[in-house]
Amino acid sequence: MEKKIYKGRGYGVDREEYLDFINYVFGFNGADHGFLKLLPKLYKEEAKPCENSYVVTEDGKLKAAIGVFVREQHVGGETLSVHGIGNVAVHPRARSRGYMRDLMHMAIDDMIASGADYSDLGGRRQRYGYFSYESAEPVWEFTIDQTNARHCFRDMPSREIAFREVTDPDDPAIEKMVLLHEKRPLYMERNRAAFLDICRSWERKLYEITDGKYGFAGFMVGDMDELTLADESDFYAVVRAYLADHGDMRIRVPLYNVDRITAASLICEHSYFHDDAKCTIFHFEKVVRAFLSLKSQTRPNTLCDGALTVLVHGIAGDEQFTVAVTNGVPTVEKTDKAPDVVLEHREAVAFFFGAMSPERMKNAYAAAWFPLPIYVDGADHV
């Protein structure tokens, strides 16, 4: 008898059944390890995880699922709609039936139709390259240890820096953290009620950072996975205090935080430049404009004057625009001028937003202006 197959949004799917299914596919037992524990922000009942998913069922039984979660990102004065892909799951006995492919294409079509600006995920480059995703979100990663600290901080006065874990959603420190978070030049929207759950994603811990003399100094998510300071000049004091407790550390710094990149580069043992995620862009002109503006704000007087016209054969349609810098001020505008560079979709993602782009190396302006500081903090990943 032919099976009844459904492919579409997960409306009407039982949440407990859904969680059991994705936990099973990922090898979680659902108790000690599972999606509800890893990402309560997404899988609590009030978050409606099934409605944010695409599923395949055979005779009513789940065989495949992917989650698509919408977030708002503030980039300088621009707001972008960023859709994250998560829990891509296919039952072991339902593989090779094209279910993942069908759901991914369905999700991408809906993201484009709904006005998403870009999408991010974690996963293998070639696996998700079939669906237009490419390595992006370049960061500098630094390793710092006690030996570095002993040499670099020996003449620095000691300070009473403390890390206090925050576990109560009503902790008054959270209000300070939210306000500080929203002062950053690049941040994902985190409402007050969900802030703790968001920061504790992936079983990380949230810490308030305090100075014995001055009080609230910032907050840390995980083991330096995210560090937000009220005063960036406190970076060395915070690193020193962290190393005293932990011995060594790794810290990833997005490209917009130039002061921290500079400070970390002076005391680190090793540094690495790499991509932190996979992205696909649906509105290249808009997203390039937002992040080029952010770069000009955080690295003033560093953009050389020039103009470059690009034609992108994007998954959401062709886009042709001119990127120009005049007296250090960037603009990105639609144009019908003949393009200087023609790019396929994934080439364009790497060209503007990736750590490595062979096409970018062929153009002096592109090599000088890009990559742009696109980034999503780990706590905001899905």
Which residues fall in each region the model found?
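C-terminal interaction segments
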Residues: 334-382
